[in-house]
Amino acid sequence: TYVLEKPYEVKKLVPPTGKKIKNVILMIGDGMSLMHMYSAWTANRGKLWLDNSQYTGLSKTYCANRLITDSGAGGTALATGHKTNYHMVGVDPEGKPLESLATLANKKGLSSGIAVTCRLWDATPADFCCHNTDRDAEAEIVADYVNCGVDYVFGGGSKLFENRADGRDLFKELREKGYQTPRSWEELAKIQKGKVFCVTDTVDTPLPAERGDLLARASMKAIDLLGQNPEGFFLMVEGSQLDDYGHFNDIDLLMQETHDFDRTIE
């Protein structure tokens, strides 16, 4: 049983009219279904920021070679518009790299970014920045970030960026590419402009009770930095650990993660 002792306030938002939309923010609740949303809505006494969504749709999530998808194939479909095989990341069923929304944005002169609460070699962030036929090829996937070109990256997973078996220091390589590489929220908060690659934890970021509103802060920092481009930006934000606690059948942490994701929308 999960009980939210103090429900959080939710306001009704009115979409602006008469303005041309130039920024795109894609928010993904990893593994999140209608069940998660309704449970979180019930726990918060019938209110969610998600209720402000103007449209609702359903998608068939099967991948190219299986009925049951995974975050590799499913995330690739979201990132590129193409279905691929189970466990593949950012490539088509033949293993050829696909262009993601992040790289398409850069090509069109917009800035791009991702902000997640998981390790950066996890499938969803990798789907937008990397290319591999196997999502478990973690060291290879992480190395792809050096050349991905995305302007803002926030997440966990420092252990595969340094002290690697191949001897590469990916943080050093990223700095050589013009990135600033803060290793904590405090360091990130001080940055006022430029490209950022922030990895705060060895693997995933901490649980909500410990990290607080870190995802919301990291997302707002992305908007602040990417928004300096007058052409606009694309940003993908993921509530990454919802999926973990669904697998673990841990309703307490699952609801904490779902509410954290919902409050990030605010």
How should each PLM-predicted stretch be described?
Residues 184, 188-199, 218-240:
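Active-site regions of oxyanion-processing enzymes, predominantly non-cytosolic
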Residues 159, 175, 193-195, 205:
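Conserved alpha-helical scaffold segments that buttress catalytic/binding sites
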Residues 123-129, 202-205, 231-232, 236-264:
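Active-site His/acidic residue clusters
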Residues 204-215:
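Binuclear metal-dependent hydrolase catalytic cores centered on His/Asp/Glu-rich metal-binding motifs
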Residues 102, 142, 223-224, 266:
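Generic structural signal for well-ordered alpha-helical scaffold segments
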Residues 219-222, 260-266:
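Short, well-ordered amphipathic alpha-helical segments that serve as non-catalytic structural scaffolds
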Residues 21-32, 105, 199, 232-240, ...:
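Beta-strand elements within well-structured catalytic alpha/beta cores of enzymes
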Residues 1-164, 168-188, 259:
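N-terminal catalytic scaffold of extracellular/periplasmic and nuclease hydrolases
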